Amino acid sequence: MAISRRSLHAIILTVLLLAATAAPSQSGSRSRSRRKSERQSTNRGRDNNSIRGGVAQTPESSPLPALDLTPQPPMEKEEPDTLAPRASRDAPGTPKVPAMPGVTPEPSGNASEPADPAELRADLRGLKGSSDDPNFYVCPPPTGATVVRLEEPRPCPELPKGLNFTEGIAVTFKENLAPYKFKATMYYKAVTVASVWSGYSYNQFMNIFEDRAPIPFEEIVDRIHGRGMCLSTAKYVRNNLETTAFHNDADEHEMKLVPAESAPGLHRGWHTTRLKNNPTGSAWIHRHGTTVDCIVDEVEAKSSYPYNEFVLATGDFVYASPFFGYRDGSHSEHNAYAADRFKQVDGFFPRDFGTGRRHGSPVTYNLLTTPMFTVGWNWAPKRPSVCTMTKWREVPEMLRAEYGSSFRFTSNALSATFTTNLTQYSLSRVDLGDCVGKEAREAIDRIYLEKYNNTHLRVGSVQYYLATGGFLIAYQPLLSNNLADLYVKELMREQALKPEERKLNATTDGKVITTTSSVEFARLQFTYNHIQKHVNEMFGRMAVSWCELQNQELTLWNEAKKINPSAIASVTLHRRVSACMLGDVLAISTCVAVPAENVIMQNSMRIPSKPGTCYSRPLLSFKHVDGEELMEGQLGENNEIRLDRDAVEPCSVGHKRYFLFGAGYVYFEEYTYSHQLSRSDITAVSTFIDLNITMLEDHEFVPLEVYTRQEIKDSGLLDYAEVQRRNQLHALRFADIDTVIKADPNAAIFAGLHGFFEGLGDVGRAVGRVVLGVVGGVVATVSGVSSFLSNPFGALAIGLLVLGGLVAAFFAFRYVMRLQRNPMKALYPLTTKDLKHPSEGGGGEEAMEDFDEQKLDEARSMIKYMALVSAMERTKHKAGRRGGTSAILNARLTDMVMRKRGAKPKYEALPETDEDI
């Protein structure tokens, strides 16, 4: 049976102690000073008990007296001290010196005294040793009725580990969610038919019909890409009826393509018409107008696996494969339209409408007509334009380990573990997977040259494995340069592949590998493998070490059982037994426990009847239960009571022994009991081997995503936000939304006059321009006045002006009437005022008599000259305002005439006083 290393060392120590009985050792566990003090204390006790020469004088024939541990009264004569203290369950931390007859024992160093640090330490040591078994065991000699044997060595397990650990370079591939993207061009004519009701001052749409018509192949090739022109008519079929729309309801003619308004994030576009035809005419008449806008719009197209259709950025679906054509077997691709709706042009030179030039290199151009538009795109073969797999991560250090029927690829850089089968995955099974081998070889070659070119060798070719979760792993095994022989073995394994198997793999139908959107399972697998590897290696090493240790210790057990069979049998059977060798087996008998208080030790190991011979183990007296008679025996090993007292040896000088007695030890010196010790008083040498377990190392996880947000966004064919954005920007790019056409009732008249004069030829056009200009000016003036009067603020202003004019006319009329009645009073109101109020000193008649006729004539002349001066100043002022030369000359001529007219009657100054007259 398996035992611990500590038990084995205990057996070895027991063997050493047995060997020491034949050659007594002079060593002890205490220092010289302590042994000296103990020896002095012991000698004082011996002197009090009449022990001489260190040998107790015990009559050989005298029977053993009654055993007791209580102190005996002093004796008058010398008696042999035959009793040692009784083994008890007292705390071993307080050892007692045996009380001899007639002697009061001295207090020992461990006696109860006031608080002392040494005593506290002793008590603690006593508590530590109190857990040992204090019982004694009586083991009868085995008779052979029960025999046992030791088990044979067991086979030890192997460490759980992976097989064929291989390092290498790996490139992981995932499912390609991104659709195939290419540039396409839409050709169509936007047809708008509007029905307008014209009122006198307003227009009202009665109906607006909008439609899209595809452009024929010939017009696209010859006119649009040939000359950058487009026809003004649109011929298309609706409800199985062929119809034709004419731009501006005029005859067919060519229109030039002009660039559309640019918008951020959109491709280029061209069209022919910015303003739509809105028919207007005389009031209260229904009119209809047609607009045809030829549009060439570059858009982005997308197609996803299996590439049977594609969708344009406008949201329009085309139910044909982008790889359909008439070259290289592409006619087998899907096409849901009739044959006459598709045309493939070889050697086509497309026109760049931005620069007006045609491309220098020819292309194969596909044209497909749908009911609403014609779409064109550059044809390309399906292989290698698309690939169902795309490269995910490059792993320079990938470890491959074989676990059972699977490979586990572990990468610390990714913190992930991928599980695959042991068999390789053929690339021929991947539909449209040509890019996998090419990209894998390029990445592996680059990593190998950068990192492993001088230290490792490649083992065979690149291997491919399909991992759980839909990841395809391209793995290149590597070997260090000193393992070239393994490289040769790997080459032999590669060459051992049967040709039939290779042919079978090459003809396997291809399929698409579906990859999960999350890699958390690989992260969990990596975590589990990381913990499993650490735990399994730790416990595996422990199991192997434990097994090997048991097998090695079994040899020691077989040898130790020959020396002390009882100890080996007791430890093995986990109970106290007595054993002896019967050939190659152990005969055992069960030991009976004896309470410690029923065991008494004698304090002398000398044999009185045989001088020079002593017992090698102390003598005991015991009884199984209280009330029975005492039985004699000898202390054996490990508290065993031997019923025979046959353990003797020649007496030697300087004898010192420690014997396990109950829960402590007893010390004999010169074959005489000295004192008792606790187990804690003896320094223990530990045989325990510490188990050094390595703690689990820390590992940080890094974020790892299979598909980015942009890849997930691009995985769908239709982007609702992009479609709505493009459709709402269509009106801004291909129409003028800022120009406003208002209702004009005279537009019909002008249109009729314009048509009339246009029919008269060049002369009619010239006359028509003059007539239309004059009529337009008159109409504009009348319209302006009419619109001003129709405005409430204008009418209010006119009313205020009229009212102000009436008030001014009234005051002017009054002034004129005053001038007619009394000009002087009107002109000189202050002068005439004195005439109405004469001076207080004179009467009226006398005043009238003061007027002189000559002075009156002079007054009349003065008034006349004042009128002339006023007229000259007005003429000069008007000439200055006009600022012209003719006006200035006219003013001067007028001045000369005025001066000449007034030359005869010269003006003379009036005298200052009446006396001067």
UniProtKB/Swiss-Prot annotation:
InterPro entries cross-referenced by the UniProt entry:
Glycoprot_B_PH1, Glycoprot_B_PH2, Glycoprot_B_PH2_sf, Glycoprotein_B_ecto_C, Herpes_Glycoprot_B
- Spell out the GO cellular component terms annotated for this protein, sorted alphabetically and separated by semicolons: host cell endosome membrane; host cell Golgi membrane; host cell plasma membrane; membrane; viral envelope; virion membrane
The cellular location(s) given in this protein's UniProt record come to: Virion membrane; Host cell membrane; Host endosome membrane; Host Golgi apparatus membrane
Coiled coil ranges? none
The signal peptide stretch is 1-22
On the Intravirion side, which residues? 814-917
The answer to whether keyword Transmembrane helix applies is: yes
One Pfam family from the UniProt entry?
A: Glycoprotein_B
Q: Where is the composition biased (Basic and acidic residues)?
A: 38-49
- Kindly give the HAMAP family that the UniProt entry links to this protein: HSV_GB
Protein name from the UniProt record: Envelope glycoprotein B
Q: What organism does this protein naturally occur in?
A: Bovine herpesvirus 2 (strain BMV)
